[in-house]
Amino acid sequence: DEVAEIAQRYADNMASITVKSTDATHPQNGMSFGDLGETDLMEIGAGQHGEGGGVRVPMMSSKETVATVADALCKKLELKAGDQTFVMVNGCGATTTMEMLVLFKDTVEFLKAKDIEVVASMVGEILTVQEAGGFQLNIAKWDDEFIRLWKAPCHTPAYSKA
């Protein structure tokens, strides 16, 4: 019950948006999952596995993209100056570590300008789709209990930290 309560409280205080720049491919036949194709467009609000439904816009810089999506997440979470957050940048499959780190830096700078503190973070390929270009930005409003739990050691088959 305690774990379910904490997980629900986390879900209630977290928001995410996926930005897709290239389509995923099927692992058996290499065919594209989507219809974005080779364009100069990106899709904001696409499903993590290439599902459509987002809005297609001309490709933007990292700073412009982060400003667009982080602003939407901040509004959804009703973040304000002094709030503490967890930020996760998840690559969609074909996004390089360098690209994810640039996106993370731009996210931290965006939040810092609003006096919103990033107290913990994760950057990497956590949930991916074969050859999909893009990223998922997750922001969660955290309290002291979430921070304490994050700092605790964790050892599981899928994730470990000391």
Model-inferred region functions:
Residues 72-162:
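C-terminal non-catalytic interaction/assembly regions of soluble proteins
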Residues 2-101:
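Mixed-charge interfacial surface used for oligomerization/domain docking
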